[in-house]
Amino acid sequence: MKKKFTVVIFTDLDGSLLHRDTFQFDSIKDYIKSLVNQGVIIIPNSSKTEKEIEKFNEELGINLPYISENGSSIHGLNLITSNFPDKLILSREKDELLKIFENKVPEKLKEKFFQISKMSKKEQENILGQKGVKLKDALNRKYTLPFLFKGNKNEKNKLLKVLNSNSLTLQEGGRVLNLCDNINKVKSMNRVVKILKKTEDKIKTIAVGDNYNDLDMLKSCDIPCLVFNDQFIQDQINIDNLIFSNKPSPEGWADVIKTALLKLNY
């Protein structure tokens, strides 16, 4: 019997599906595969680079479509339907963003801005939690610039105001801030849903995250899911029908997805 609707899961990776510190997901790998085999469409929507998500797919053993660098580019929709695009780029390249940053941001704010790519390898390893090839993949960015901002809240708000007035944004992840084009996870998610609706009559979206840069994505889906993060205050989140786990990733990811699918009677 044909299902009444198609389930599409948009998921953050670090701290949501992958363990926040070890980046492992072995304990839920079979569950993810079983979902795909049931016809559930899973789309990683992450700040990770193309290389990093491609290697995640290799480890999983399935080529999933994905959104990389905080919504900057969409990949592999042709894996869902052959006439869908293989790649959509929604961002200007990082060099163009940096040029705007250099020309428009006041010097006093620039002094508080520390690019990860210009730090020593040891500092990069400590901040990103990666080494060797994995560190290289994490730094292999085309559309975003990860950085630390060592200013106060008022200075950060001033920086954000300058960036927004020049069509740039800040995306806050678990480890770093990212300088991005005027794009984010939810804009890319909505773009994908619009494309999928060309062939799917009814779609139910589940979004999974664990941090501040996931909240807009959670607010814009049918079933929002938050994976436990002890560095994140859940009580401050005002999202209707929010499902949240008591366990961290990766087990917490499986818990919220199971609850979401029950809610959908899937």
Question: What are the language-model segments listed below?
Answer:
Residues K2-K4, F25, V176-Y266:
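Mg2+-dependent phosphoryl-transfer enzymes with acidic/Ser/Thr/Gly-rich catalytic loops
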Residues K4-T22, L218:
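Asp-based phosphoryl-transfer active-site loop
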Residues V7-I9, L64, T205:
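The start of beta-strands in P-loop NTPase/AAA+ ATPase cores
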Residues H19-G39, K94-D95, N157, N182-I195:
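Short, acidic loop-to-helix structural element flanking the phosphoryl-transfer center
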Residues Q24-S117, D230:
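Active-site phosphate-binding/coordination module
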Residues V36-N37, N164, K219:
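Anion (oxyanion) recognition and catalysis
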Residues L60-I62, N70, N166, S220-D222, ...:
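Short, structured coil segments at secondary-structure junctions
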Residues K108-I206:
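Conserved acidic, metal-coordinating active-site core of Asp-based
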